[in-house]
Amino acid sequence: MGKSEKRVATHGVRCFAKIKMFLLALTCAYVSKSLSGTYMNSMLTQIERQFGIPTSIVGLINGSFEIGNLLLIIFVSYFGTKLHRPIMIGVGCAVMGLGCFLISLPHFLMGQYEYETILPTSNVSSNSFFCVENRSQTLNPTQDPSECVKEMKSLMWIYVLVGNIIRGIGETPIMPLGISYIEDFAKSENSPLYIGILETGMTIGPLIGLLLASSCANIYVDIESVNTDDLTITPTDTRWVGAWWIGFLVCAGVNILTSFPFFFFPKTLPKEGLQENVDGTENAKEKKHRKKAKEEKRGITKDFFVFMKSLSCNPIYMLFILISVLQFNAFINSFTFMPKYLEQQYGKSTAEVVFLMGLYMLPPICLGYLIGGLIMKKFKVTVKKAAHLAFWLCLSEYLLSFLSYVMTCDNFPVAGLTTSYEGVQHQLYVENKVLADCNTRCNCSTNTWDPVCGDNGLAYMSACLAGCEKSVGTGTNMVFQNCSCIQSSGNSSAVLGLCNKGPDCANKLQYFLIIAIFGCFIYSLAGIPGYMVLLRCIKSEEKSLGVGLHAFCIRILAGIPAPIYFGALIDRTCLHWGTLKCGEPGACRMYDINSFRRLYLGLPAALRGASFVPAFFILRLTRTFQFPGDIESSKTDHAEMKLTLKESECTEVLRSKVTED
């Protein structure tokens, strides 16, 4: 009876002692971590507007995730294989959930969001925001500039920064320990497919994250305490802030839920393809595998500097790190600021932009990773062939990406900012051009951003600068009339918001996204072959440390600095800054889209172009380089084949004896 109960209990635990069960749990962890990461990137614009901070600070917040990751990556990669890897991954998922909760906390600690406007906050009629002659200017941002320093909410973005650091700390063990766990206990021929499934999970997470971000961006940030009918802004307005905090609460819950299964997995698994006896005892092959794994783990603590020297002297490994740093600099810059670029370039809201990104870009990425893994498994592609496959696929996608330079739109036509009051475009913003003969008598503020669109198709920075004298309606339906600067036949009225860019610009957005579909598919198709070059160019005992060192270099040389320097460069293309209560600049309201486009498309293209130089040298080195991964793979396959032959011989002997009896 006791043995029976023990066997049932053992079976209950042993259901987790399978590599495929671990793969399922790890895929869920990949989904949850990529979900929260994508949601964070999608909400950066909303966070920028909520706290009134420049893009360079937003870049610091984004890079803080990598700072947290950097704090533990070498420690985890070095000691991770000695410790209980599944439990460490589970703890990491729970810590990520804690970080997401901390990010959402400022919403509950600070007051309501107050967007920049010259319109009255109530329905009471007021002439203070109209064009009125012989009036002293009463639209100063505040009487006491020290209010900005005194206000607690002006530094609330630090909570987001710290929360993102904690999220980065939690994410640290998932990839290096998860990949090394699979590499240790999966068949070598199945490893590319399993990694392809993980990469697919990393595209499902962003898909869910972008859909969640799209939904939250359409909800006003203070939905629980503000009557949205009184708002004078819409989701397409650059002052609009969506309910960014809701999604982080969802991400916190998902990350904590995905942590539970990892606490039930054993420290080691039977090597895939090696069978256990029915009573749960290990066969000789499995004992040998476990003994070898233990020896490798003891060795990694003794020979840390030996392994570091070996990795540093591995030319393909070092060149691969250089390629990854350049490619990730380009990728992080492109992906982090893509919502901002599409909003400014094509005049779309954040909700529309992130929805289109999820709809057009992520399915081909998911498909590409899956097909790439299947190709590697089906045709048993060698490392040398994988290197060539990855190189030529990346090069073809790189050349295709240059078509994006054609899919461009002009700046929003804003009088005194991008065009003259007669509608003639000019390149540079000069402050005294904000005023014209039609509004100099109005004594308007030249700093406030509360744009209106005139019947003449030209936008103005405020109703006062448009020379408007009265209004009808309330909220977003407000219409301004008798606007002296609007010279259209028979009418001189304006409505709230910037003017639309027109159908031609919308068509170019569709073409841009179609190019992105093919580009994402081709690039992701090269992902698995490229990653297998990294895994197979290092010895098995160096694998965990090698993967961790690779991730460390990417984070310190790309993940942390890239969004910071790119954000600072984007700030230099700003045409008009928002104004805080103290009169200091807040978030940027409008960019010079031509300069922004050259920066957004040009810098990543230059970085990616440079990455093909070390990639070419890798192709040259593969001709003579002896890949440890291929040697170990062939040995494992040979051993498994011999084991299968012996099992077949034993089976035949038993059958013959049964026949004789």
UniProtKB/Swiss-Prot annotation:
Phosphoserine modified-residue sites: 633-634
Extracellular side, ranges: 41-59, 112-154, 224-241, 333-352, 405-512, 571-604
InterPro entries: Kazal_dom, Kazal_dom_sf, MFS_dom, MFS_trans_sf, OATP
Keyword Ribosomal protein: no
Signal peptide (UniProt feature, chain positions): none
PROSITE patterns: KAZAL_2, MFS
Glycosylation sites: 123, 134, 443, 482, 491
Transmembrane segments: 21-40, 60-80, 87-111, 155-183, 203-223, 242-266, 311-332, 353-376, 381-404, 513-535, 545-570, 605-622
Gene3D superfamilies on file: MFS general substrate transporter like domains
Pfam families with a match to the protein in the record: Kazal_2 (PF07648), OATP (PF03137)
pH dependence: Optimum pH is 6.5 with estrone 3-sulfate, taurocholate, prostaglandin E2 and L-thyroxine (T4) as substrates.
Cytoplasmic face of the membrane: 1-20, 81-86, 184-202, 267-310, 377-380, 536-544, 623-661
Origin superkingdom: Eukaryota
Catalytic activity: estrone 3-sulfate(out) = estrone 3-sulfate(in); taurocholate(out) = taurocholate(in); prostaglandin E2(out) = prostaglandin E2(in); L-thyroxine(out) = L-thyroxine(in)
Disulfide bonds: 438-468, 444-464, 453-485
Molecular function per GO: bile acid transmembrane transporter activity; organic anion transmembrane transporter activity; sodium-independent organic anion transmembrane transporter activity; transmembrane transporter activity
Gene Ontology CC: basal plasma membrane; basolateral plasma membrane; membrane; plasma membrane
Topology of this chain in the membrane: Multi-pass membrane protein
Record key words, sorted: Cell membrane, Disulfide bond, Glycoprotein, Ion transport, Membrane, Phosphoprotein, Transmembrane, Transmembrane helix, Transport
Domain Kazal-like: 432-487
Location(s) in or outside the cell: Cell membrane
A biological-process GO annotation: monoatomic anion transport
Annotated tissue distribution: Highly expressed in brain, liver, and kidney but not expressed in heart, spleen, lung, skeletal muscle, and testis.
Chain's role: Mediates the Na(+)-independent transport of organic anions such as taurocholate, cholate, 17-beta-glucuronosyl estradiol, prostaglandin E2, estrone 3-sulfate, L-thyroxine (T4), the cardiac glycosides ouabain and digoxin and thyroid hormones. May play an especially important role in the brain accumulation and toxicity of digoxin and in the hepatobiliary and renal excretion of cardiac glycosides. Shows a pH-sensitive substrate specificity which may be ascribed to the protonation state of the binding site and leads to a stimulation of substrate transport in an acidic microenvironment.
Name of the featured protein: Solute carrier organic anion transporter family member 1A4
Lineage of the organism: Eukaryota, Metazoa, Chordata, Craniata, Vertebrata
Gene name of this polypeptide: Slco1a4
